[in-house]
Amino acid sequence: MSTLDRHREPVLRQPSTAARVAGAGAGEPRPVTGGPHPLDAPALASLTGPHAHFAERRGRILRYPVDVTPWTAHPDAPDAQDWADLAALAGPGGTIGLNTLREEPPEGWEILQRVAGVQLVDESVVPEPDAEAVRLGPADVPEMLDLVERTRPGPFLPRTVELGTYLGIRRGGALVAMAGERLHPPGWTEISAVCTDESVRGQGLAGRLVRAVAYGIRERGETPFLHTSAANTGAIRLYEALGFRLRAHPEFLSLRAPAALPPTEEARKAALR
């Protein structure tokens, strides 16, 4: 695949994935560090790159607005100040999404959900526009949210549509399938919210929309990638058949912050004076 070659680290070549899977505050930013490859920390690469205008930041923690997407950028091994900054961004008792933590969260945090995932990259996808696909925008959000509620492809919120191009297919005027763009590390774009209504499943609409979204990404000279649950073997088989290949096994977590925020670094320093 030509575009992937420009960004490539070796793609894991192995049997089918589906077969195998049965102290600074907001005013004092600290350097944010991530993995050597943008897809090792895709939220960080997005929020410090093409999606920087969405970023809400405190210390080394960056997140998207709560009505855009749950993705949060954080160090591989958050320290006490990072957790304090996460709590401040989430708010007392608020929820926040993290990925692939090396250690369990500190006392006071509650893990609401832990999902084993897979990350796949375009290796040999044949992208092509789809004559039936239409561009979706803010006016379509109520229908998009309704389709997501029925099909559960993963998080899709009222402003997620602002992250990139979303395409849909309508039958009888009703939105029955969609897919679009979410995370945007430099040189890469994530395909997300791939879903089809039960009434039209088996007609190949999901594959058509993935290829159509991939076409727009490739036209920009970028490479598509995507995430899904490791348990979603049907989706993994589809993506592999389209030409995506396994790259990594991230873990996605949804956490609830402590009901009472920890003291800030400034407050701790003041108490010592």
Language-model segments: what does each one mean?
Residues T72-P78, V194-R201:
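A short, internal acetyl-CoA/4′-phosphopantetheine-binding micro-motif in the GNAT/acyltransferase core
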Residues E103-W109, G207, A230-A248:
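Conserved active-site alpha-helix within GNAT-family acetyltransferase domains
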Residues Q81-L86, G202-I217, I236-A241:
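Conserved acetyl-CoA-binding loop-helix of GNAT-fold acetyltransferases
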Residues E110-D122, H227, R245-A259:
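Conserved catalytic-core motifs of GNAT/GCN5-like acyltransferases
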Residues M1-P105:
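N-terminal charged segments
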Residues S2-L39, E123-G154, E265-R273:
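Short amphipathic alpha-helix that is part of the acyltransferase structural core
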Residues P155-T165, I169-D197:
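A conserved beta-strand-loop-helix scaffold within acyl/acetyltransferase catalytic domains
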Residues L98-R102, G216, F225-I236, F252-P262:
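Conserved beta-strand-loop-alpha-helix junction that forms the acyl-donor binding cleft
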